[in-house]
From Swiss-Prot:
The lineage of its organism: Eukaryota, Viridiplantae, Streptophyta, Embryophyta, Tracheophyta. Belongs to the thiolase-like superfamily. Chalcone/stilbene synthases family. Keywords: Acyltransferase, Flavonoid biosynthesis, Transferase. InterPro entries: Chalcone/stilbene_synt_C, Chalcone/stilbene_synt_N, Chalcone/stilbene_synthase_AS, Polyketide_synthase_type-III, Thiolase-like. It comes from Pueraria montana var. lobata. The gene is CHS. The primary product of this enzyme is 4,2',4',6'-tetrahydroxychalcone (also termed naringenin-chalcone or chalcone) which can under specific conditions spontaneously isomerize into naringenin. This is Chalcone synthase. It is an enzyme of class 2 (transferase).
Length: 389
């Protein structure tokens, strides 16, 4: 007779969780950041607010964003004037859009990840779906399971309303699932659409305007599993260690509230300061066991909440400018896509590392860190180990 300990041991994987594939997707509608203020104030019938428009133009100029992708086109917004007002009841219209479009965009990213993985989708055992764009029952996880044709007994986890730190959260959960369920293959999907947050400008709510200058739409998917099958599965990164913490004295720093008017955001001015003040401790906990204290010796994937956060983190840690290159490139080309951002950066980094002839998926380095920052203020930390190219 086998013991309980033997049964437990047999259920667990032998090696660490690895990322086996990455896929990304964006809506076709591309928005140029340099002309966005003109478009935004015109479509929201706010062109008379000249001072506010100038302020918004400065926000967009300082954002370090060149372009973003958005599901919302001019035609859609003209059909839904309440979404263009500052605080008009519009939740039904927003919900009708996102409950369809969030799983649809997620499917596009997931299909690419499954193709790269190269295994039949029947081998997917778990699904994690994450979005801050709309809520429904059954959820986007159910819709995606149906749309992809996954087996009905795939174990699903639906994460709604997590916000910008959740790219780290999904990797933490996927790591635990992969390492504690032998043979598990976890499909992780983050899909975000700004139709829930788009609204007209107001000079009494400038943090809403910050969101209008930064947020973009995108979906990213990864396959996570332990003990990759040799010659069949090709790991890209190992997920070595994870943590989540609430920054002290940060209550109200980033809040989001779902109301009749859609999802509203409230930001304290010192969000970059709170993040940079707490980053040292998070890094020490993560890398002290590895005897790493030189943070220029690791590769960096940080949620690009905005350029000010990246600037202050760089300054606090004395990071070389090239450390945040992949992060800044994704911010520039896509804007802040909330939970999907860090997965886009992982994809960007492994592609550029290969293109530039570097030895590992982590810009030629062995160890790296992935950070998520969001409501709470919550900080997610993931220690990554790159793979030889």
């Amino acid at each position: 007779m086998v013991s309980v300990a033997e049964i437990r041991q047999a259920q667990r994987a032998e090696g660490p969780a690895t990322i086996l594939a990455i896929g990304t997707a964006n809506p076709p509608n591309c928005v140029d950041q340099s002309t966005y203020p003109d478009y935004y104030f015109r479509i929201t019938n706010s062109e008379h607010m000249t001072e506010l428009k100038e302020k918004f133009q400065r926000m967009c100029d300082k954002s370090m964003i060149k372009k973003r992708y958005m599901y919302l086109t001019e035609e859609i917004l003209k059909e839904n004037p309440n979404m263009c007002a500052y605080m008009a009841p519009s939740l039904d219209a927003r919900q009708d859009m996102v409950v369809v479009e969030v799983p649809k965009l997620g499917k596009e990213a997931a299909t690419k990840a499954i193709k790269e993985w190269g295994q039949p989708k029947s081998k997917i055992t778990h699904l994690i779906f994450c979005t801050t764009s709309g809520v429904d029952m059954p959820g986007a996880d159910y819709q995606l399971t149906k749309q992809l044709g996954l087996r009905p007994y795939v174990k699903r986890y639906m994460m709604y309303q997590q916000g910008c730190f959740a790219g780290g959260t999904v990797l933490r959960l996927a790591k635990d699932l992969a390492e504690n369920n032998k043979g598990a293959r976890v499909l992780v999907v983050c899909s975000e659409i700004t139709a829930v947050t788009f609204r007209g400008p107001s000079d009494t709510h400038l943090d809403s305007l910050v969101g209008q200058a930064l947020f973009g739409d995108g979906a990213a998917a990864v396959i996570v599993g332990s003990d990759p099958i040799p010659q069949v599965e090709k790991p890209l990164y190992e997920l070595v260690w994870t943590a989540q913490t609430i920054a002290p004295d940060s209550e109200g720093a980033i809040d989001g509230h779902l109301r009749e008017v859609g999802l509203t955001f409230h930001l304290l001015k010192d969000v970059p300061g709170i993040v940079s003040k707490n980053i040292d401790k998070a890094l020490f906990e993560a890398f002290n066991p590895l005897n790493i204290s030189d943070y220029n010796s690791i590769f960096w994937i940080a949620h690009p909440g905005g350029p000010a956060i990246l600037d202050q983190v760089e300054q606090k840690l004395g990071l070389k400018p090239e450390k945040m290159k992949a992060t800044r490139d994704v911010l520039s080309d896509y804007g802040n896509m909330s939970s999907a951002c860090v997965l886009f950066i992982l994809d960007e980094m492994r592609r550029k590392s290969a293109e530039n002839g570097l030895k590992t998926t982590g810009e030629g380095l062995e160890w790296g860190v992935l950070f998520g920052f969001g409501p709470g203020l919550t900080i997610e930390t993931v220690v990554l180990r790159s793979v030889a190219i």
